[in-house]
């Protein structure tokens, strides 16, 4: 009885409280509850805003934590989770209404309340993040799913929730969205960041976001790949939000109008540009498994506006709308099982093939109607705004007080699933929440406020986008470049070029040819630094000992970064690009490649320079560049620079002191030095002091040195087991640098790097041999030296990422040996370990030649992607095999040239030659060898394999690898990249390029036979090796009968046979396929003309 009385008392108290609130509804702190009453047409501005204020108070701010300021993911049931992304949109909703209230002079304190609700949330997130500063430090050095910031926190305490095993916390989109809204809100006048500790922490968040282009994450939907199996992917939406955040925060002062130089954020422009390139390469796809995704809407439209390519924007948006739009909202992505009736809520991950169950019954999310409304307002498209407002109205619900509720999703109940699958769109869907039970989807509620305020013109796009993330096409000519991703419509940039000679005697020599240069001494007090010194300076950026943050990671500075002028500790500093840096990788010592790199760098700068002021490009000329045959190409390049145009880029060559006035100056004020701080030591580029009375000579004193010095007179296999004293004696006696390098490599493995030789330690001796060989262009010795000292190019990781975002896989490892398949971007250290582990066991030089190939292919695939058409997996070891095979063909009866003796520029040209698709003058054996080594496939090949698999219940076998029909067809779709990669993986066990090409031809034959004979189907596993063997046997029978050639196991003559024609390979393959098909049952067909009774 007492319990019943207590319950009655509680109910009575709630009734009384509700009546009391109704009586004092005029208070500015308690919104009216009569929102469902009709609104008059002649509403005042106050009335309009009061309408939305009541909604915000009751559907958003009511749930904000009074301690942390965060917003819960679930509004009832005592759930303590707060997700960063949801809280950010809630803060944005309150901030948007605060911006509207700024138009009213006497707002009764509402502007202050709403602004500080947003500030409280933003600072609450910052508080949660800063408590995980150790994770930021780890993630900077090693970005992995187990070192990232958490994305879910306790709503009241800010404690981290859920372990890395329980939840996919790696959601870079959430961190990027925080940075973006931080900039937008501070730009509108809010004070969110209070001290330099917080500034240094935000700077470290920027360091984490800069490398998003190579960090696969779990994405907006927290599930990673479409299969929801715990694997991460590179997502366009994450990369796009990161790109937008970096553009917005670059050069931004976190203290707002009251800021100083210490509160400015720095962004690596080259890292940002890699994010831009990655995004443009990935789109219109969301990821490898997601053909499209609704998560792209906030990426390409509000709030990120990450695209500056209108064509790509339209293509991406059209794909999202066409494939995902429904009556109740947008599907997140196809075969999304989230909250469907068939999803098992007790399991975190799906089983293989489970996503097939969700085909056609995916939940629809009304929130994306709101995104489309906002997009329509920004783009000045009232028709789009009205279209989606009309779609939104019938799916909205209302609370008991009449407040609008945006359901999180609409689902198909279990009883109607089969009807919906049989007749898509026929069944009524039901909302996940309607507000009457206290359940609200706060992300949707916040976006509703923003969309309605914009649609009702209570705020303008410029109000909620003060940093101009979106700029209309007509205004792009005069846009401020600092905060926008759009540049001028016409990019007619002139690049400033300063020519710097290594020495005074080189300057005098070039002057005789009319080339005016300056030496490092002549540009003083301006200092010239290599980019490593600038990296050393940036190491001081963001350091905070209290938080345990070390500052900017040791990452190279790219061409955009070295095109600015820097003020460092009172000095004016300019930097030469990394392509002139001899310490990076030996390829810069090849003059022809250096000239190509200079042209490419200038074209790159012209295309992607987005700042006021002109870029400054330093061309560093070394004495070594003009020796012998290298002089004329360098002179031609310098003459082109002097004329003012090179490689299609306009340039202006002048003295450095003159060019500085029009350049961009970056003040590195974070290098402030107090009495207690130690001054960093920086080394500028020093002028070469030649011996007295010496002159620069055009011709090398030993023109035949490359021919004489290349071929070593020692063999590793012979010398590796000889005693150390014999090796040392031979080392002292031989003058061949390649032989010296080989002998030193044996000593390095046996005795270690600190073993003493005649010229010091082994490691120092190898380094000297490497330098000498580079100066003499003895490429065999250079590659030996680079391999033994494990040289690694800083550009390998970005180039591998380029492969991946162009939809390719890459394998590292020697031909005929174990290979490492790279499907996701990796850090430079991991790639270096893979290269030297996989390649050194076969041939020491393989590790460095593979790096050359990666660099060359990265450049080619960016500029001429059509050369890689039909090549899904780039197998570096196999491409090297194809190049060596090509050299054998060219050599004919003579010994083939050694690939390792060619210069890097000759290697690049050889690569371009074999990539050319037209090989009409070649015999079929050679063509199949090259195409097989390149893993080249005909157009539509993977789609045809899918069609074969549909008619092959037991799957396909080749080289012992089985491609099953199930769960392949259930898990994947025909046009999904993962299916194509699975086919490539199946073919990966084939060890002969020409045989692989025959198998590709066989699959095309099987596809055509099945297409023309719909009544036929394979009954058992299709063993492709068996079919090739049968075809070869038939070929041998014909050869024996017609040409009286004895049967043999060697298939060379078969490989050299044209595919088409009376006795082409396809005729034999077709016969083998038909024999296998006719062994099975034939499906009866009443329309068959052969059926006569």
UniProtKB/Swiss-Prot annotation:
Q: Which cysteines share a disulfide bond?
A: none
Answer whether the UniProt record assigns the keyword ATP-binding to this protein: no
Superkingdom of the source species: Eukaryota
- Name the segments for region: Disordered: 689-716
Q: How is it modified after translation?
A: Ser-701 is probably phosphorylated by PKA.
Disease named in the record: Glycogen storage disease 9B: A metabolic disorder characterized by hepatomegaly, only slightly elevated transaminases and plasma lipids, clinical improvement with increasing age, and remarkably no clinical muscle involvement. Biochemical observations suggest that this mild phenotype is caused by an incomplete holoenzyme that lacks the beta subunit, but that may possess residual activity.
The name under which this protein is listed is Phosphorylase b kinase regulatory subunit beta
What taxonomic classification does the UniProt entry list for its organism? Eukaryota, Metazoa, Chordata, Craniata, Vertebrata
Activity regulation description: By phosphorylation of various serine residues.
Its GO CC terms are: cytosol; phosphorylase kinase complex; plasma membrane
Q: What does this protein do?
A: Phosphorylase b kinase catalyzes the phosphorylation of serine in certain substrates, including troponin I. The beta chain acts as a regulatory unit and modulates the activity of the holoenzyme in response to phosphorylation.
Give an example GO molecular function: calmodulin binding
Q: How does it assemble?
A: Hexadecamer of 4 heterotetramers, each composed of alpha, beta, gamma, and delta subunits. Alpha (PHKA1 or PHKA2) and beta (PHKB) are regulatory subunits, gamma (PHKG1 or PHKG2) is the catalytic subunit, and delta is calmodulin.
Provide the protein's localization: Cell membrane
Q: Which SUPFAM superfamilies does the entry mention? A: Six-hairpin glycosidases
Q: In which pathway does it act?
A: Glycan biosynthesis; glycogen metabolism
Q: Where is the lipid attached (S-farnesyl cysteine)?
A: 1090
Question: What's the family?
Answer: Belongs to the phosphorylase b kinase regulatory chain family.
């Amino acid at each position: 009885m007492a319990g019943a009385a207590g319950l009655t008392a509680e109910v009575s108290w709630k009734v009384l409280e509700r009546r009391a609130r109704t009586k004092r509804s005029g208070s500015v702190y308690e919104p009216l509850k009569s929102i469902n009453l009709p609104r008059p047409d002649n509403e005042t501005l106050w009335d309009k805003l009061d309408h939305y204020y009541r909604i915000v108070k009751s559907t958003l701010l009511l749930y904000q934590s009074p301690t942390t300021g965060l917003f819960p993911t679930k509004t009832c049931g005592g759930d303590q989770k707060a997700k960063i992304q949801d809280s950010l949109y809630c803060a944005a909703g309150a901030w948007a209404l605060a911006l509207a209230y700024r138009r009213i002079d006497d707002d009764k304190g509402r502007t202050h309340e709403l602004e500080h609700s947003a500030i409280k949330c933003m600072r609450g997130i910052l508080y949660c993040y800063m408590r995980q500063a150790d994770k930021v430090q780890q993630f900077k050095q090693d970005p992995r799913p187990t070192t990232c910031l958490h994305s879910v926190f306790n709503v009241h305490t800010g404690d981290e929730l859920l372990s890395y095993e329980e939840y996919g916390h790696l959601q870079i989109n959430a961190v990027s969205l925080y940075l973006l809204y931080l900039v937008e809100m501070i730009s509108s006048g809010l004070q969110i960041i209070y001290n330099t500790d917080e500034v240094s922490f935000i700077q470290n968040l920027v360091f984490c976001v800069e490398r998003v282009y190579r960090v696969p994450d779990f994405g907006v939907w927290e599930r990673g790949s479409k299969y929801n199996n715990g694997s991460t992917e590179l997502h366009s939406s994450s990369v796009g939000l990161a790109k937008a955040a970096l553009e917005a925060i670059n050069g931004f002062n976190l203290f707002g109008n009251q800021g100083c130089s210490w509160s400015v954020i720095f962004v690596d422009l080259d890292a940002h540009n890699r994010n831009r390139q990655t995004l443009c390469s990935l789109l219109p796809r969301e990821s490898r498994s997601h053909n499209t995704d609704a998560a792209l809407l906030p990426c390409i439209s509000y709030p990120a506006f990450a695209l500056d390519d209108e064509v790509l924007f339209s293509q991406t948006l059209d794909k999202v709308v066409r494939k995902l739009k429904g009556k109740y909202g947008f599907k997140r992505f196809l075969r999304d099982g989230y909250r469907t009736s068939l999803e098992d809520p007790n399991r975190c991950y799906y089983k293989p093939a489970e996503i097939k169950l969700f085909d056609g019954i995916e939940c629809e999310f009304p929130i994306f109607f709101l995104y489309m409304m906002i997009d329509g307002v920004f783009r000045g498209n009232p028709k789009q705004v009205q279209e989606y407002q009309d779609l939104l109205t019938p799916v909205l619900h209302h609370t008991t007080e009449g407040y609008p509720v945006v359901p999180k999703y609409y689902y198909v109940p279990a009883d109607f699933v089969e009807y919906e699958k049989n007749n898509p769109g026929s069944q009524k869907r039901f909302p996940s929440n309607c507000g009457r039970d206290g359940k609200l989807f706060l992300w949707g509620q916040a976006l509703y406020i923003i969309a309605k305020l914009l649609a009702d013109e209570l705020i303008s796009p410029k109000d909620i986008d003060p940093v101009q993330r979106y700029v209309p096409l007509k205004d792009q000519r005069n846009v401020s470049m600092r905060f926008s991703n759009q540049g001028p419509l016409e990019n007619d940039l002139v690049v400033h070029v300063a020519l710097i000679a290594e020495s005074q005697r080189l300057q005098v020599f070039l002057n005789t040819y009319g080339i005016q240069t300056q030496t490092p001494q002549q540009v003083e007090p301006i200092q010239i630094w290599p980019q490593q010194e600038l990296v050393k300076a940036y190491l001081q950026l963001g350091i905070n000992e209290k938080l345990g943050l070390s500052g900017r990671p040791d990452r190279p500075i790219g061409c955009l970064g070295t095109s600015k002028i820097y003020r460092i500790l009172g000095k004016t500093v300019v930097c030469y690009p990394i392509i002139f840096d001899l310490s990076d990788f030996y390829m810069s010592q090849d003059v022809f490649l250096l000239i190509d790199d200079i042209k490419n760098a200038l074209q790159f700068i012209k295309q992607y320079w987005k700042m006021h002021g002109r870029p400054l490009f330093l061309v560093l000329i070394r004495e070594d560049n003009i020796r012998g045959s290298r002089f004329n190409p360098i002179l031609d390049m310098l003459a082109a620079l002097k004329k003012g145009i090179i490689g299609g880029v306009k340039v202006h060559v002048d003295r450095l002191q003159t060019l500085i006035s029009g350049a961009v100056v970056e003040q590195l004020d974070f290098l402030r030095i107090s009495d207690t701080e130690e001054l960093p030591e920086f080394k500028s580029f020093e002028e070469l002091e030649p011996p007295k009375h010496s002159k620069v000579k055009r011709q090398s004193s030993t023109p035949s040195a490359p021919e004489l010095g290349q071929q070593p007179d020692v063999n590793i296999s012979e010398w590796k087991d000889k005693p150390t004293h014999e090796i040392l004696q031979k080392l002292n006696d031989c003058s061949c640098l390649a032989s010296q390098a080989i002998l030193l490599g044996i000593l390095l493995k046996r005795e270690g790097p600190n073993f003493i030789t005649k010229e010091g330690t082994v490691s120092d001796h190898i380094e000297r041999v490497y330098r000498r060989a580079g100066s003499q262009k003895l490429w065999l010795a250079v590659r030996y030296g680079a391999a033994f000292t494990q040289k690694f190019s800083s550009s390998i990781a970005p180039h591998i990422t380029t492969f991946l975002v162009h939809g390719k896989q890459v394998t590292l490892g020697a031909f005929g040996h174990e290979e490492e398949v790279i499907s996701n971007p990796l850090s430079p250290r991991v790639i270096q370990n893979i290269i030297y582990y996989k390649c050194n066991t076969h041939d020491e030089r393989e590790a460095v030649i593979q790096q050359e190939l990666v660099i060359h292919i990265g450049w080619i695939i960016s500029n001429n992607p059509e050369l890689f058409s039909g090549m899904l997996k780039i197998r570096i070891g196999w491409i090297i095999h194809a190049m060596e095979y090509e050299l054998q063909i060219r050599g004919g009866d003579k010994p083939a040239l050694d690939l390792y003796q060619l210069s890097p520029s000759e290697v690049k040209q050889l690569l371009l030659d074999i990539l050319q698709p037209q090989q009409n003058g070649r015999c079929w054996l050679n063509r199949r060898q090259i195409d097989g080594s390149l893993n080249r496939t005909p157009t539509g090949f993977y789609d045809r394999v899918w069609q074969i698999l549909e008619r092959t219940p037991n799957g396909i076998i080749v080289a012992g690898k089985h491609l099953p029909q199930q769960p392949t067809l259930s898990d994947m779709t025909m046009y999904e990249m993962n299916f194509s990669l699975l086919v490539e993986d199946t073919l990966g066990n084939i060890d002969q390029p020409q045989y692989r090409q025959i198998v590709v031809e066989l699959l095309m034959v099987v596809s055509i036979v099945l297409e023309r004979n719909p009544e036929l189907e394979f009954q058992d596993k299709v063993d492709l090796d068996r079919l090739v063997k049968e075809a070869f046997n038939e070929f041998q029978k014909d050869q024996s009968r017609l040409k009286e050639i004895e049967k043999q196991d060697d298939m060379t003559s078969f490989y050299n046979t044209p595919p088409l024609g009376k006795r082409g390979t396809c005729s034999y393959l077709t016969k083998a396929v038909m024999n296998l098909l006719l062994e099975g049952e034939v499906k009866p067909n009443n329309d068959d003309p052969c059926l006569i009774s």
